[in-house]
Design a protein with these regions (language model features):
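Flexible "arm" and connector segments at domain edges
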Residues: 1-60, 64-90
């Protein structure tokens, strides 16, 4: 399960060096305003999907993907977020 997440994070990190015209992820990494807009949009769509009990998994995946890209673009490592969550378990 988490291997897929790790693979996604690695792909996002690799896309930093791609041409934004050829990679959607690279485009998001290079345009933080667009990425913030997408995260907001995807969260709204997830909430609507949960309320309608329809397409929840798809929308949740979109939120996770866009959030991971935004974190990476902002210099926030998912590993640091996971460490913070682990601290909160105590």
């Amino acid at each position: 399960m988490f291997k897929s997440l790790e693979e996604l994070v690695n792909i996002i990190r690799e896309r930093k060096n791609f041409n934004p015209q050829k990679s959607y992820t690279s485009k998001l990494l290079n345009d933080k305003n667009l990425n913030v807009t997408k995260v907001k949009e995807e969260v709204k769509e997830l909430i609507e999907a949960i309320q309608k009990n329809d397409n929840k998994i798809h929308e949740a995946a979109d939120v996770i993907y866009h959030l991971l890209v935004l974190l990476e673009a902002s210099g926030i490592k998912i590993e640091d977020v996971m460490d913070e969550l682990k601290k909160r378990q105590k």
